[in-house]
């Protein structure tokens, strides 16, 4: 490997400075494998090239603190792209060989975050997010119908719901901040068939014979 550097010579009345602008690392055949440059204002970038001199990894920073990195396949298609912004936001995306988005994740400056996973047809299959007071996740079938929905909150409350292929709720479970918890199972006619509840004092209500959910005595 060989190193080639380009410099700019700048003279002023009190001292001399040398500012490196571009670096190139070449292989034994004289092909560029790594290139990098910096600007006096803080911008910088670096790229790694394969033996065919195609860029495979690139990264850069801007003067305001923003930065990005990208991984490319042998055909020059971006497969992974990540970036951070000056205000603290950040994101990452993953693409398949057909350049279709498969995974996307992002965080905001306030700590909120989200993630999406898509199938090969570009349909959303999993979505997850964190909010200021909790978090949630959803799972979708191949027809784009929500099948599972779960949520948690910072106060200890949480719930999960399961839906059938007709998007009718079949199972619902929840816990509350005071320690109460319950679960219900519905038949295809939306009637409650099983309902159980627990209370903070240790009371447990088991399923009843009718279609109505139990009530605390």
What do these predicted ranges mean?
Residues 13-40, 45, 209-217:
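N-terminal segments that cap or nucleate solenoid repeat domains
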Residues 39-203:
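Thr-biased low-complexity repeat/linker tracts and other Thr-enriched repetitive architectures
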């Amino acid at each position: 490997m060989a190193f080639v550097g380009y410099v700019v010579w700048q003279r002023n009345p009190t001292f001399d400075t040398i500012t490196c602008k571009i670096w190139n690392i070449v292989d034994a055949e004289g092909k560029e494998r790594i290139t990098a440059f910096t600007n006096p204002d803080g911008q910088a970038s670096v790229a790694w090239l394969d033996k065919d001199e195609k860029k495979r990894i690139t990264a850069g920073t801007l003067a305001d603190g923003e930065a990005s990195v990208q991984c490319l396949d042998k055909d020059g298609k971006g497969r992974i792209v990540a970036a951070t912004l000056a205000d603290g936001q950040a994101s990452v995306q993953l693409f398949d060989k057909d350049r279709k988005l498969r995974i996307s994740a992002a965080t905001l400056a306030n700590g909120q975050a989200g993630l999406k996973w898509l199938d090969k047809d570009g349909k959303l299959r999993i979505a997850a997010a964190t909010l200021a007071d909790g978090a949630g996740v959803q799972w979708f079938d191949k027809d784009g119908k929500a099948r599972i929905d779960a949520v948690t909150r910072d106060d200890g409350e949480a719930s999960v719901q399961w839906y059938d292929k007709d998007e009718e709720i079949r199972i619902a479970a929840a816990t509350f901040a005071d320690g109460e918890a319950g679960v219900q199972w519905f038949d295809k006619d939306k009637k409650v068939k099983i309902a159980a509840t627990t209370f903070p004092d240790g009371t447990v209500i088991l399923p009843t014979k009718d279609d109505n959910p139990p009530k605390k005595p």
